[in-house]
Amino acid sequence: NTTENNDSYTEESSGNDYEEESNAGGGYSATGEAVVAYASQFIGNPYVYGGNSLTNGIDCSGFVQQVFAHFGYSLPRVSDAQAGAGRGISYSESRAGDIIVYSGHVAILTGDGGIVHASNSAPYPQGGIKYSSNALYRPYIAVRRIVD
C-alpha cells in the first residue's frame, strides 16, 4: 500500500510540477487570447471588495492582477496604478488580453468589443466575475497592453 500511495503521490506531484512549470514558462509566451480564456473560467465567481481569490471573492483590480500573475506578469494591486502598467495604446489598437481602465474600475478586453471583469453590479445578485458585451459602456481613462 505504501508503495502504491507513493507512486500515486509521485505521479500526482509530477503532474502538478509540470503544470506549474508550463504556467511559469507561459509568462514569456502568453497570448492575449490565453489571458482571456484563463480569466473567463472564473466567470460566475463572487465579487468581494479588497478580495484576492479568483474562486472565493475578488475585486476588479485584484482580478486583473491575479489573472496576469498566472502568466508571470506582476501588476500593481489598484486600478489607478494599473493605468500605468504595460504600454499605453489606443482603444482602436486594442486586442484580446489588453486592459481597459475606467475611473475606479479595470477590466480585461476580450477582443470582441467586450470585457471580462469583477463587477459589483448585476447580473449576479451581489456582483461577480462576468462578461459584459460593451467595453465602452462608460468613459475610459487608459488602454494598456501587458502581453506583447
Residue ranges and their predicted role:
Residues 29, 57-58, 128:
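Short alpha-helix boundary/capping motifs
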Residues 1-46, 138-148:
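Intrinsically disordered, low-complexity
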Residues 105-108:
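A conserved glycine-rich beta-strand in the N-terminal activation segment of trypsin-fold
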Residues 38-96:
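Catalytic cysteine-centered active-site loop
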Residues 31, 59, 135:
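Short acidic-hydrophobic sequence patches enriched in Asp/Glu that either
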Residues 102:
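Short, structured active-site "lid" loops
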Residues 26, 73, 77-90, 110-148:
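Aromatic- and glycine-rich peptidoglycan recognition patches
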